[in-house]
A protein has these predicted regions:
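Short, structured loop/turn "capping" segments at alpha-beta junctions
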Residues: 7, 217-220, 267
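Short coil-to-helix leader/linker segments, especially the first N-terminal amphipathic alpha-helix
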Residues: 1-17
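Active-site rim elements
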Residues: 83, 150-152, 192-196, 241
Length: 326
C-alpha cells in the first residue's frame, strides 16, 4: 500500500516528494483545506416554539480542516507524520504527531498522537472520506439523566496520545492493540491517575481485528486514482476507557465494521455499542447503554465525480432500555 501510513500517498501522485537516491529517506509535505456549506433542519419533537424557536440551526459555511503537515519514511522501517490543523483550537491544533517502527510486516510499534483503533469512519486516509463530516452517531455526545456537565461521552474515540502495536498476518488479518490517555484530541498532556475502583492505570485500552480476504483494504472511501480495486474488510473493535469524563465513568465500546471497494463502487456499514458505568465515588449504581450505526455508499459516475449517500441512526438517550421496554 502506498498509503500505509494512513495519512497521504508517498508514491508521488499528489504534490511532490523529496527522497534520497537510494530511497531510504522519503519526505513529503502536504496541505489539505476542506470547506463546506451546511444546512441542518431539526425536528421540534412537539416542543413549544417558545422553547425551540428555530428548526434550522448549525447552518452556513465552515472550514473544518486546514491541515498543514509532513510525512515520510526513514531507513526503510520508520514512518513519521506531523500535522497541524489551523482550523482547530487549543490542544486540537496538533492533529497528529507520531513515528512508527516496523520491525516486520507482522509487528510494528507506533508512538505519539494518532487515530485510536476504533471505527472505519475515523481510520480513513486523510482527505479520502466519502462525506465532509463524520457520522453524527460517532461524534454526538450522549444524554444522561443527571446534571453532570463534565460527563458527555460520545462513541467515537478519534485522535489520542498513546502507544500501539499493530501488524498484518498472512496479508489478510490485521490487528491493532494500544494504550492511550483517553482524553481525546484536545489534550496533549499527561493527566491520568490510577483507578480507585479497579486499581489499574486510568487509560484507554483499545484493540481492533480485521479480516481482508482479498488482500489489504486501502484506507479510502473513494479515490479517483484507484478505480480498479476489488477489496473487502470485516472488522471488530473494542475499548475500555477507565475513569474517563473527569474520573466519573468507565466507558466500554464495541464496534462492528464492513467496507467494500469494487471498481467504482464503495460500500460501508458500521454498528457500535457503548456502555457508560459510573465510578463508585459518583454513588450511581445504574449504567447506561447506547447503540449507533450507519450505512453509506459512493459511486464514481465520472472519473473525478463521486455520488455519495449515508443513512445514520443514533438515539442519544439510553436507547437499549428503550428497545427492551417498547
Amino acid at each position: 500500500e502506498d498509503t500505509e501510513n494512513g495519512v497521504v500517498s508517498l508514491a508521488g501522485r499528489e504534490g511532490f516528494t523529496i527522497e534520497t537516491k537510494k530511497g531510504d529517506f522519503v519526505f513529503k509535505p502536504y496541505l489539505l483545506v476542506q470547506t463546506s456549506a451546511n444546512f441542518n433542519w431539526y425536528d421540534d419533537e412537539g416542543l413549544d416554539k417558545a422553547y425551540n424557536q428555530d428548526n434550522i440551526a448549525n447552518s452556513g459555511f465552515s472550514i473544518p480542516y486546514a491541515v498543514l503537515g509532513f510525512t515520510g519514511k526513514a531507513f526503510g522501517k520508520v514512518a513519521f507524520n506531523l500535522s497541524i490543523n489551523a482550523a482547530a483550537s487549543g490542544g486540537a491544533l496538533l492533529q497528529q504527531a507520531w513515528f512508527d517502527v516496523q520491525l516486520k510486516k507482522q509487528f510494528a510499534i507506533r508512538v505519539g498522537k494518532f487515530k485510536t483503533p476504533f471505527s472505519h469512519a475515523y481510520l480513513t486516509t486523510l482527505g479520502e472520506t466519502l462525506l465532509p463530516q463524520l457520522p453524527v452517531s460517532l461524534t454526538s455526545s450522549v444524554i444522561l439523566p443527571y446534571s453532570l456537565n463534565a460527563v458527555t461521552p460520545n462513541i467515537g474515540t478519534g485522535f489520542d496520545l498513546g502507544v500501539e502495536i499493530h501488524g498484518l498476518v498472512a496479508d489478510k488479518f490485521g490487528y491493532e492493540v494500544g494504550l492511550f490517555n483517553g482524553t481525546g484530541a484536545s489534550v496533549n498532556t499527561a493527566s491520568k491517575t490510577m483507578s480507585d475502583d479497579w486499581h489499574i492505570p486510568s487509560l484507554l485500552y483499545a484493540g481492533r481485528l480485521t479480516y481482508m480476504p482479498k488482500g489489504v483494504m486501502p484506507s479510502t472511501q473513494g479515490n479517483p486514482n484507484r478505480l480498479n480495486e476489488d477489496k473487502i474488510l470485516f472488522g471488530l473493535s473494542g475499548s475500555i476507557n477507565v475513569e474517563s469524563e473527569n474520573e466519573s465513568t468507565n466507558d466500554t465500546r464495541v464496534g462492528l465494521e464492513f467496507a467494500m471497494l469494487k471498481n467504482k463502487l464503495y460500500l460501508a456499514a458500521e454498528a457500535y455499542y457503548m456502555n457508560v458505568g459510573f465510578t463508585k465515588r459518583q454513588k450511581i449504581n445504574e449504567s447506561y447503554s447506547f447503540l449507533g450505526g450507519y450505512v453509506q455508499g459512493g459511486y464514481f459516475v465520472a472519473p473525478r465525480l463521486q455520488l455519495a449517500a449515508r443513512y445514520d441512526i443514533f438515539n442519544r438517550n439510553d436507547n437499549i432500555k428503550t428497545l427492551i421496554h417498547s
